[in-house]
């Protein structure tokens, strides 16, 4: 908005001297005055439109004058030719330049700050990106050290693990485990193999002639066959069979153990050496082996008459003429041999039954 100050007003003038003046008419004379005093033309009130003009409109808007006649009526006259004002000077965008410059300064400042931030972030990223590269380059020569032992331990090659020429510790353990099973004589069908060996004619001939002598030699002459046993402990070849529950848990009583054999260190076996005496002892032990199915023997009372029971030597008697022409054993001889393997000791010699009897008597 452009504000203009009004200049000094001139009365009784028909035309205004400036475009920004307000001309007012004098006070009307009373009616009692002479008409000669009313001969003059009534001055007009000229209102400049420039004072009412709003900033931003065009300068073609005309200027009007308001005149009051003798009769007291006001009339609007046409536009008066007034010198045009310099709107270019008034409408100079001087205040607009200042915000433009300030905006530019702010924009440049913001851009410079953004550039600085980008530069800082790039430098930081470069620093962090360079650190792992240096660490990896420093670790690479350490990993590829000239010492062969460290490199083999850290990075073992898969070919060496899979090669059969250089077995691992696991393969060695497996080999030792299988050899240990072979040394102990582990066989799944042991009962069937023993029966086949027992029914052969060679074993029957040896067992009929030297059954008692083989048992005694096996008990007293185990020192001669120490290299055949893995832990110097012979098989149980005695005809004593125990059918009590305690004997099933511990089939070999403590009285039958040979402490000197158990305390001795283990020795290496020699399975390739042929020993007839060992084979005969094994055959005798297979003869006296009890069957796989459980069997409950009759317990002889302590106060009973032994004359009522048959002598146990009858069970040990084997028919010499029991062999058939083909060399196979008859059913009678087989039954007699199986009965001889089921001979039970008297109650006084059975530790388990004595212990049970003591418990019952205490109750």
Curated annotation (Swiss-Prot):
It comes from the Eukaryota. Residues 1-20 are annotated as: Disordered. Keywords: Phosphoprotein, Transcription, Transcription regulation. GO terms for cellular component: cytoplasm; nucleus. Signal peptide: none annotated. One of its GO terms (biological process) is regulation of transcription by RNA polymerase II. The modification Phosphoserine is found at residues 157, 292. Present with 861 molecules/cell in log phase SD medium. Interacts with transcription complexes SCB-binding factor (SBF) and MCB-binding factor (MBF). Interacts with SWI4. This is Putative transcriptional activator MSA2. It comes from Saccharomyces cerevisiae (strain ATCC 204508 / S288c) (Baker's yeast).
